[in-house]
Structure formats: structure tokens, C-alpha cells
């Protein structure tokens, strides 16, 4: 959520930043709603003060009867009626909060202006792409290996689900352990095993609700399946005041993730690129405003390390204003090279959310010996999605005979297996 005080003091800049997100100017409407809310709040405070004064006089009166006493009683009753009406108006006039909840984060100064991914800025590349490489797509390879099943899975769960078998299931497990080991041992992230069912307020805190309600799966009794472990991890500091010396806090978690893929009809309908259920290792950092820019580079580099160790070509893109996520003020996308598609595809997003999530969930820190609190900054990065990493391995490590060479760093995690070959039932 954006800071209403900042909007109040920076109306023109606010409208300018909204225009970069392709949203019409809204400062005038917000100012009007804000004035109305502040006027009601001011009246409530005045009436509360008047009630306190009159109640004190009533309490000190020697005689609890007579015209003066009864007149004061009538005044207090009238004040209570006024207060009840004003508090009702304040509690039921949610238009300002509803409007603020629909605004995305303000783009950082470094974020390029642009409408879509074609305007994203290349930051760096890693590894060489080979235009003459074998180019079967991952689902062709997986099906031929008899280790990736879509047809029978569709009978169980419908489309956008997959069943992995044998050595591909083992590769999935190996990748999870490998990624967690790298992030905990080399990058100082603390491993968490969080819940995947959360309440709506946790989704709201993370910026998923109310705007993206249709993109998640909801239960009938008030829970939602997480679309990313970011939701669970950032909420670990909700409604807390953290001592400054404990920052940064860095969490890593592997969880299954669930997305309805609303609005993705016709996109990536084959294979494992876009599924309703997928596994992902997620990174979250909690830090101070002064350190969040450096922490953004740190968490992005941690994510990149996985691809470097797997020797997978990739590039890092700075997203433009029109392509950034809702809660982010600045985002790097990491895109891995897929020979089967002959293009780079997103495998990770690494975002600095500033105090956007922290304001929603009241996550603060304070210096030693101080009573003043400041909102923390939250950051997140994929570190990485297991399915898309498997896609990249299958396509980049495929052999002429359809087998898949295991990347060197995964051989021990695979129990010494160096190659995945077709499974014969």
C-alpha cells in the first residue's frame, strides 16, 4: 500500500508515477476522499473531547438531579449519538482504502519507462547460446523418455498438470536439495518450511489481494493456496517490531505453489512452463530502507548462482514500468536460454518491494535505545522454480539419442547417476 501522506504532499509526482504504470491521474480524487476522512476524524476527536469534559463535570456534581444535571446528561447522550453516526460513517466509507489498495507500487527512478516486455533493458548475459544445438522441446524429450506424463495426468486433474516419474522425479528432488544447500551454505539464507494454506489477510499483506483474487485457488472455509512462498515468508514479520541489529533477515523455502493462470488461455499450453501446480524455491529478504538497494543486487546474485552452477545460459533484464509486478518498485527478470524454443524465457523474478508490503502488514524495525519505529523493506526472488529449471536442463543437456546428461553439480544429488535414459516398463 502507498503512503497517503506521501501522496498528499506529492500530488503531481504521484500522478506522473501512475502514468508510468499506465493509470490515469488520481490525486484529485484521493485528495477529496482524504479530506472527507480527515474531517470526520477531526469531528470525532472534538466530540470525544466534549464528552470527556461534560462527563467529568457530571461526575463532580454534588447533586445528581436537577435541571443542570439533566441538561448535561442530555448533552452527553446527544454527543454519543453524534459519535455513533460519525464512527459509522468512518468505518463504512471504505472508498479511500479500496482505492489505495488497487494502486501498484511507485516505480524506482532507475526503472525504464515502457508498456511491455519489449521495452525491458538488458543488464547482463551469462554463457553462450548455440544456434546449432539440438532443439527438441522438453515435453518431447520427457515423453520419449517415458518419464513425463501429461495424458494420464489430465484424466486425474485436467490440463496444466504433469506427473514426473523415475529419474525425472529424482531430478526434481535433487534440484530442491541442491538449491536449498546453495542458498543456506553460500548465501546465508535461513531455511523455512512454511504453510501453503494461508488466510486472506496474509495474501493481502503480500499484495496478492484484492487485485489478484481470481489468480489464486480459494478453499470453501476462508483459506487460499499460496501462489508463491513469498506470501508465507514475508508474513513471518507481520505485526512485529524487529531490532535493527537483527537485519537483514533472509529466508529460503521450498514449497508447492498454485496458480489459476487466469488470463493465460492459449499461452504455453504444452509442457511444464505454465502449470497450475509447481514447486519453487523462494528467497525473501527483510532489511532497512538504506540497505534495500544493495540487498536487491545480493538476492538477484543468489538466484543467478544456481544457473551458473548448472552452466545454463541466461540473461538479466531490468523490467520497464509496464511489465513490473504489482508490489514491486524495481524488478530484475532472469531469463534462461531454451534451445527447443530458440529464445530466452523467464525463470526468475527478483523484486525490491520497498515498504509497500511492510505498510500493509505493519512490519517495522527500531534502533537500539530508540522508541521510533520505521517500516522495513521487503525483497523477494525465485531461487528457482523447479519445473522451469528442469525444462532448461532437459533442453540444454539433451543428446542425439534422446538421453539427458546430468549437470556435474547434480551428480552427487542423483546418487552418482550421470545420464537419464528412457524408462522401459
From Swiss-Prot:
Comment, domains: Consists of two distinct domains, a catalytic core and a N-terminal extension that is involved in tRNA binding.
UniProt keyword Lipid metabolism, yes or no: no
Chain's gene name: serS
Substrates-to-products reaction catalysed: tRNA(Ser) + L-serine + ATP = L-seryl-tRNA(Ser) + AMP + diphosphate + H(+); tRNA(Sec) + L-serine + ATP = L-seryl-tRNA(Sec) + AMP + diphosphate + H(+)
GO cellular component: cytoplasm
Keywords on record: Aminoacyl-tRNA synthetase, ATP-binding, Cytoplasm, Ligase, Nucleotide-binding, Protein biosynthesis
Pathway involvement of the protein, from the record: Aminoacyl-tRNA biosynthesis; selenocysteinyl-tRNA(Sec) biosynthesis; L-seryl-tRNA(Sec) from L-serine and tRNA(Sec): step 1/1
EC primary class: ligase
Domain of life: Bacteria
Family stated for the protein in its record: Belongs to the class-II aminoacyl-tRNA synthetase family. Type-1 seryl-tRNA synthetase subfamily.
Binding annotation for L-serine: 228-230, 282, 382
EC number: 6.1.1.11
MF terms in GO: ATP binding; serine-tRNA ligase activity
Compartments, as annotated in UniProt: Cytoplasm
Subunit organization: Homodimer. The tRNA molecule binds across the dimer.
Protein's job: Catalyzes the attachment of serine to tRNA(Ser). Is also able to aminoacylate tRNA(Sec) with serine, to form the misacylated tRNA L-seryl-tRNA(Sec), which will be further converted into selenocysteinyl-tRNA(Sec).
Annotated binding of ATP, by residue: 259-261, 346-349
GO-annotated biological processes: selenocysteine biosynthetic process; seryl-tRNA aminoacylation
Protein name as annotated: Serine--tRNA ligase
Lineage of source species: Bacteria, Pseudomonadati, Pseudomonadota, Alphaproteobacteria, Rickettsiales
Amino acid at each position: 500500500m502507498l503512503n497517503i501522506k506521501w501522496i498528499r504532499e506529492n500530488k503531481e509526482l504521484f500522478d506522473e508515477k501512475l502514468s508510468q504504470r499506465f493509470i490515469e491521474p488520481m490525486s484529485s480524487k484521493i485528495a477529496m476522499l482524504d479530506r472527507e476522512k480527515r474531517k470526520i476524524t477531526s469531528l470525532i476527536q472534538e466530540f470525544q473531547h466534549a464528552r470527556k469534559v461534560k462527563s467529568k463535570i457530571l461526575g463532580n456534581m454534588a447533586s445528581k438531579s436537577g435541571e443542570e444535571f439533566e441538561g448535561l446528561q442530555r448533552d452527553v447522550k446527544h454527543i454519543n449519538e453524534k459519535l455513533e453516526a460519525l464512527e459509522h460513517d468512518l468505518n463504512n466509507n471504505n472508498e479511500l482504502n479500496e482505492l489505495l489498495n488497487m494502486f501498484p507500487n511507485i516505480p524506482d527512478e532507475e526503472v525504464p519507462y515502457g508498456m511491455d516486455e519489449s521495452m525491458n533493458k538488458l543488464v547482463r548475459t551469462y554463457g553462450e547460446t548455440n544456434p546449432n544445438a539440438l532443439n527438441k522441446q522438453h515435453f518431447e524429450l520427457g515423453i520419449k523418455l517415458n518419464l513425463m506424463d501429461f495424458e494420464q495426468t489430465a484424466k486425474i486433474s485436467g490440463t496444466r498438470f504433469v506427473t514426473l516419474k523415475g529419474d525425472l522425479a529424482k531430478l526434481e528432488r535433487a534440484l530442491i536439495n541442491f538449491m536449498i544447500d546453495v542458498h543456506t551454505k553460500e548465501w546465508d539464507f535461513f531455511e523455512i518450511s512454511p504453510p501453503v494454506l494461508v488466510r486472506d489477510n496474509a495474501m493481502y499483506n503480500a499484495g496478492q489481494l484484492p487485485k489478484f483474487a481470481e489468480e489464486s485457488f480459494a478453499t470453501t472455509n476462508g483459506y487460499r493456496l499460496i501462489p508463491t512462498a513469498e506470501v508465507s515468508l514475508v508474513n513471518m514479520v507481520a505485526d512485529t517490531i524487529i531490532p535493527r541489529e537483527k537485519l537483514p533477515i533472509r529466508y529460503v523455502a521450498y514449497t508447492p505453489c498454485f496458480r489459476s493462470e487466469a488470463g493465460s488461455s492459449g499461452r504455453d499450453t504444452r509442457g511444464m512452463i505454465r502449470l497450475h501446480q509447481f514447486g519453487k524455491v523462494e528467497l525473501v529478504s527483510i532489511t532497512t530502507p538504506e540497505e534495500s538497494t544493495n540487498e536487491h543486487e545480493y538476492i538477484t546474485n543468489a538466484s543467478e548462482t544456481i544457473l551458473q552452477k548448472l552452466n545454463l545460459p541466461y540473461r538479466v533484464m531490468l523490467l520497464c514500468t509496464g511489465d513490473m509486478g504489482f508490489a514491486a518498485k524495481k524488478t530484475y527478470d532472469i531469463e534462461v536460454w531454451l534451445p527447443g524454443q530458440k529464445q530466452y524465457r523467464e525463470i526468475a523474478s527478483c523484486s525490491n518491494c520497498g515498504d509497500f508490503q511492510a505498510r500493509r502488514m505493519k512490519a517495522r524495525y527500531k534502533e537500539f535505545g530508540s522508541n521510533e519505529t520505521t517500516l522495513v523493506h521487503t525483497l523477494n526472488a525465485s531461487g528457482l522454480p523447479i519445473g522451469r529449471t528442469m525444462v532448461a536442463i532437459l533442453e540444454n543437456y539433451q543428446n542425439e539419442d534422446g538421453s539427458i546428461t546430468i549437470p556435474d553439480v547434480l551428480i552427487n544429488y542423483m546418487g552418482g547417476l550421470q545420464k537419464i535414459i528412457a524408462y522401459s516398463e
